[in-house]
């Protein structure tokens, strides 16, 4: 079970929490589509800022968005000019007042989503997939990861037949619910087609009371 399922979804309510924090009965579908639009818009607009996670909270006529990014300076801009523009554009999507919080990801090497995007970027630049995987694994372990597994699927190295290759170092216990495992997925758009990149980073066990 732990091998197949999304590791974050598997741990929701145990050691992980939801990225969308709101409750709606009649408007559930509308809010869900709105969340998707917000996330797609922010990912596209702020791609160079290294977006790790976007949390959305809703209350009455207000929407609070927490953005976790590796380079928050690119989002804020000079004297906060970029944030104000962002607020206006998001208010147009949601038709509500929008508040934005920006949190810095201090160690991007330990963030699975950012590692996956980094590997995908290297593959797009025609760097050999084994080299890209090994480089990311080494830097994550250097910054304190207990274990990491990177999987690449697709026409690797321009091969006729698609295949899956993975590289792992350390422990990645997928069945242990108390294991703090971060998961990230990215796609590399190469001339041969799309290569999927999955990253699992084990950061240690969360013990009761922590």
UniProtKB/Swiss-Prot annotation:
It holds the Pfam family KH_2. Residues 38-106 form the KH type-2 domain. CDD domains: KH-II_30S_S3 (cd02412). One of its GO terms (molecular function) is rRNA binding. The keyword rRNA-binding applies. Binds the lower part of the 30S subunit head. Binds mRNA in the 70S ribosome, positioning it for translation. This is Small ribosomal subunit protein uS3. It comes from Trichlorobacter lovleyi (strain ATCC BAA-1151 / DSM 17278 / SZ). The lineage of its organism: Bacteria, Pseudomonadati, Thermodesulfobacteriota, Desulfuromonadia, Geobacterales.
